[in-house]
Amino acid sequence: YVGMYGEQDADLTYRLWQTLKQKINEEEVGEIYKLESSLIRVLIEMRRRGVRVDLDRAEQVGKELKNKEDKLLSQIKNWYGITPDLWAAASVAQVFDRAGLEYPRSPKLNAPSFTSAWLESHDHKLPLAIAQARKFNKARTTFIDKMILDHEVDGRVHGELHPLRSDEGGTVTGRFSCSNPNLQQVPARDPEIGSLIRSLFIPEEDCHWGCFDYSQQEPRLTVHYSLLTKQEGAQEAAEAYTDDADFHQIVADMANISRKEAKNINLGLSYGMGKDKLIRQLGISEEEGQILFDQYHERVPFIRGLRDTCARLGSNRGFIKTILGRKCRFNLYEPMSYRDTPYPYEKAVETYGKGVKRAFTYKAMNRLIQGSAADMTKKAMLDLHNEGILAHTQVHDELNISVKDKQECEKVIEVMRDCVKINVPNKVDAEIGKSWGEIENYKEYFK
């Protein structure tokens, strides 16, 4: 008899809620709790509906990719008499040895190592052929076979969206992760493979595929918070921030440096990257790097100002609060004067003595901006659902949605743009097409 057991479940849940409700009020996280709770029904609907896929085309593309891979492997065999196992470094090394080509080795084991970056940057035909064959193999096995054909049910793929769980800190910032399959991993950057795989995802019947992307979402939030905290130079950046403004170009113009340098520094600082690592990434000398950094911080002081303000708040209060009230906490401690393994306070004191400080507060600005971006995207999804519009997928600052016409497309843009108010113009870019991989500016498409 399970009646009493079921009653206990209900009673314990109710009593637990009475305690947690009080805790939510004490912590002043009611608004974000309401958002996350309301979002559950949206995510259930998204998973239940799934995303339509073109199965016939998926199988056809899979065969085409297999033919391209086989052709490259056949060429390699004709050149050197060996057909390598593409993902086995020892096997690839045999072909390189036959070709008389040197290759990198891993520092610890001194084993052959063939990264994509190294293969693609080589000017010899063999590494380029290996890189291409690997690309075709991965596109077929990872994205067509495993992501689509192994997961489709009645022509649809039903991925799981996790609003507060991720291998990369979803519980810290509130960003979504996805699994079974991970539709956030559908390739985008590769001009050949990206559009090919994305073209297999198609809209609902009698609809168009819409890709709605927040334009420079995190940089806009950076300027917003710099204004709120009255950072020096923030007003100048805000005044330059029109609808079509490019944050990295604004900073480049302010600092009198190239856009590439500005972008690398902007992103590096927002992620809490140290100066030495940034200098290595820019590929410049230490002396050149110091001059560049001095110039950057002198002319664009609001970035460092906001970073320091966030780190101080995280250290003093133990948390940073995002735009809709999410608390990103800093509950681990490390030694005051050097870096070591961080622990909860009592264990840290037991291990290192009383001279401890909160760990990871240098990441406070990143958590504020990423967390606020997650808040904005989630609020947009909820507001759209309230308008009867349900997203197919969410990929960081992008929502993919089936739209009936130009009017509905512009409704999505308006809802996403206005769901959270910030102190600089917000912008949503929209591209429309007959599939995810065949999209263009919506104004051109609906001409």
Outline where the language-model segments fall:
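Conserved "right-hand" nucleotidyltransferase catalytic core of DNA-directed polymerases
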Residues: 1-193, 202, 206-208, 215-218, ...
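Catalytic phosphate/metal-binding cores of nucleic-acid and nucleotide-processing enzymes, i.e., regions
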Residues: 22, 35-42, 358, 378, ...
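Conserved catalytic core of nucleic-acid polymerases
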Residues: 48, 101-104, 124, 253-390, ...
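Metal-dependent catalytic core segments for phosphate chemistry
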Residues: 218-254, 332-355
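Short hydrophobic/aromatic beta-strand micro-patches
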Residues: 281, 400-404
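Helix N-cap motif at beta-to-alpha junctions
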Residues: 286, 404-408
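A common structural junction motif
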Residues: 299-300, 414-424
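Conserved short beta-strand edge segments in small beta-sheet-based binding/regulatory domains
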Residues: 421-433
